[in-house]
């Protein structure tokens, strides 16, 4: 069983449900919404570790986090039931509770720990937040590589992304009409390719190279966060979809960048 852990309860699960309906991801997963931000995730990880790095159990962590919702399916699971764990969170570097340097340090720690889906889990981060998936002009967007967002803009990015896009909300990614199924599927293919292409240029790797989220975060720090107080706009879900499949399947789904 695959465990997908989302920061929020609505948008990310809706997107994954659409991905499954479009045949871009296989069924057979359980979804758990953490319902808090990445800094809270770091805090809970550290509490459960008790000073021993890697000692915390992700299923146990989620059961504690969701203790006020006894009907959550996570309470029926044990670690032995789960073969792979993927987590999807916003970078949220505008968090006013902490200095930027503290947030960067904590994200770096989490990415060091959460780098393997078959162990503690693999963390994917959206920069600056999940709404990055909407921040595009008509697909394919040849200018996507240059889009950045100032950290100080914080939650204003949600409105910015909505106004920037020519599409109506998430309709271009969630099929409301079966007659538009092929069009929406094509939109996902474009999104996966342009997010991966931007990430690999940022990290100076090729389409064939393994690109870790840790390496991507370091490139964000070196080229955007530290010098300019900004992030290069990237969404977690398209990057996950590229990573999840082998090249033969990427070609079948229209995700491939290898020519």
Each language-model region and where it sits:
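Short beta-strand/turn micro-motifs composed of small residues
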Residues: 6-7, 89
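Extreme N-terminal starter segment of soluble prokaryotic enzymes
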Residues: 1-3
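C-terminal accessory helical subdomains adjacent to catalytic cores in phosphodiester-
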Residues: 14-38, 42-59, 63-259
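Short acidic, Gly/Ser-rich segments with clustered Asp/Glu that frequently serve as metal-coordination loops
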Residues: 8-13
